[in-house]
Amino acid sequence: MPTLKDIRIRLKGIKSTQQVTKAMKMVAAAKLRRAQDRAIQARPYAGKLKEMLASLSTKVDTSLNPLLSPREEVNKVLVVLVTSDRGLCGGFNANIMKLAQRVIHEDYAAQHAKGAVTMICAGTKGSDFFRKRGYNVTKAYPGVFQNLDFSSAKEIAELASQMYLKGEADKVILVYNEFKSVLAPNLRTEQLLPIAPEEGTEEAAGSEYLYEPSPEAIIDELVPKHLNTQVWRVMLESNAAEQAARMAAMDSATENAKELIRVLNISYNRARQAAITKELSEIVAGADALKQ
């Protein structure tokens, strides 16, 4: 049975941890508001670019732009994985890394068996995890979320485009956490390259636009902007989902600490009561012995 001193030491440690988790929850909540606003603001622009690209692709020969042209055979696959730089965010990283493994081992098992699956990892957790397990991580961006800006997303998009154009990848897949709500993150996979209109964009593509100077010239300008914007949107979504996951995890840890403190206080009071009872019994026994 633990002594009173042992329980006091444990109580002190748990109370200290509770203060840390409570502070981290408050910090994550503040960061979540900013991250959520940025993610939501990026969605309309990214969606409109995708809609315009879908409209243009119906008016030009897509084979003239290699980033719009699917390959006859998909022999090489590039997976762009977005995780976080730090932990203490529940299952945020573990779940998305499991999804990435499932995509590689199930959807592209043949390519993986030939060593033809490469990865770009944004975030320290993903790059560390997959490099330790022998995956081909061609480029990592550790610390990217410590100061998240558009230039990082642009660099990733340009690298993916170059690898696709050089034939180092026949398909580029994005794997990330999409922000839905604080309690419901959404694991997502999207095809980045070749660019293909999603379901429902065909109707939007029917909208009539007047193009100057020409659809071909505009699409050449629009494609890189679209890629940069999509990667930027994905990173903003992931950042917001990370802060939501961390806030929820720290809230749960704080509540667990509160419950543990309650249980330990009960144990402490019982142990203290038992010690007092024992001392009283010894005093009474000593007094009786003196009377005899």
From Swiss-Prot:
- Subcellular location as annotated: Cell inner membrane
- What's the protein's topology in the membrane? Peripheral membrane protein
GO CC annotation terms, alphabetical: plasma membrane; proton-transporting ATP synthase complex
* Gene Ontology BP terms: proton motive force-driven plasma membrane ATP synthesis
Gene Ontology molecular-function annotations: ATP binding; proton-transporting ATP synthase activity, rotational mechanism
Q: Per UniProt, which keywords does this protein have?
A: ATP synthesis, Cell inner membrane, Cell membrane, CF(1), Hydrogen ion transport, Ion transport, Membrane, Transport
Q: Which family does it belong to?
A: Belongs to the ATPase gamma chain family.
| Description of how the protein assembles with itself and partners | F-type ATPases have 2 components, CF(1) - the catalytic core - and CF(0) - the membrane proton channel. CF(1) has five subunits: alpha(3), beta(3), gamma(1), delta(1), epsilon(1). CF(0) has three main subunits: a, b and c.
State what this protein does.
Produces ATP from ADP in the presence of a proton gradient across the membrane. The gamma chain is believed to be important in regulating ATPase activity and the flow of protons through the CF(0) complex.
Protein name according to UniProt: ATP synthase gamma chain
Species source reads: Chlorobaculum parvum (strain DSM 263 / NCIMB 8327) (Chlorobium vibrioforme subsp. thiosulfatophilum)
Q: Which gene encodes it?
A: atpG
